Amino acid sequence: MLHKTRGIVLHTLPYGDKYLIVAIYTELFGRVGYLITPARRGKRGVAQALLMPLSLLDLEVEHRNDRDLQRIREARSLSLPTALQTHPAKNAEALFLSEILYRVIREKESDPPLFHFLFDAVRHLETADAGIANFHLTFLFRLAVYLGIRPNRETYVEGRYFDLLEGIFTEEVPLHGRYLNADESRVMARLTKMTFANMSLFAFSHTERSAILGHVLDFYRLHLPGFPELKSLEVLRALFE
């Protein structure tokens, strides 16, 4: 049966000599694996330029319940032309965040609020002209809400410690040792106020931003079983040195 849906490219993997398996987060079906024949000279197929990380697509897809990999009949770009691919910082952000999404989104059911958040976030990245170095931090904090692991900022008071296991700020040092000190906790509380609209107003040194990202990834790792080491992390960190 044919369906029309929007989608966001998460990951592309070669399959044999002629095919690609592409993980796409779709508006109608959640995460779906598609078996794709790349377009070649004189032959129909999906242009590989459409399959870059976090590409936004308008799709006509064929779904059948008796197969694990579905098919794309037509694909049209909804992304702004070359907005991510030609900008080194935005390209690094897209690689990093698409890797995270590929690892944490497993649902094969539609989740409209999550899809709309992701679609709008990619649009913000495409059009941003300031604060790009803070985009991934903003994104990860906002994504945590949809994953059900949002840090509880309401518990913050100056001098408290952020408990990475419980996701709250506490007066006492947690005995389990998974916590941030008072200075780190102050920064964590500050970051919970950051949005795509105001991210350019938050100034951090490379060292601070790298440390903050490490804490956020530790938080994800503690709350999302199987969260892996990320191949694109060092590329992102090196770019913003």
Question: Which residues make up each language-model segment?
Answer:
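Non-catalytic alpha-helical scaffolds and adjoining flexible linkers that form interface surfaces
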Residues: 1-241
